[in-house]
Amino acid sequence: MQSISNCPIGLVSKNTINSASTIAEWVACPWKYINVVGSGRYVSNKPDKITRYDLLKAAQEAEMQELLTRNDMKGRHKRNKKSKIALETIAEENSSTESLF
């Protein structure tokens, strides 16, 4: 996966990049244009690092959005429990400020 300023491009939608007024603005502050990571921790606490918790949270939010668009209520309920347990586990492991980058 390519990255700009430690920000994985896979987390940014094409429309978001296209809506940036200039490429210089995007390169200067790429975290302002991330629309999948909704935790708020990413921008405010440490814009230069993405933790495993942030990546899992983004994946969970994307999965939930996909399930809502398909109106698959049974799958949503079962997967939501599994994701919540995984998030709690990662949050506990992450308490030592461990990060991927």
Swiss-Prot record:
Gene Ontology annotations for the cellular component aspect, listed alphabetically: mitochondrion
Subcellular location: Mitochondrion
Keyword annotations of the record: Mitochondrion
This protein's record includes keyword Mitochondrion: yes
Induction remark: Expression is induced in the presence of citrinin. Expression is induced by the PDR1 and YRR1 multidrug resistance transcription factors.
Main function: Mitochondrial protein that is involved in citrinin resistance.
Name assigned to this protein: Citrinin resistance protein, mitochondrial
Organism: Saccharomyces cerevisiae (strain ATCC 204508 / S288c)
Gene that this sequence comes from: CIS1
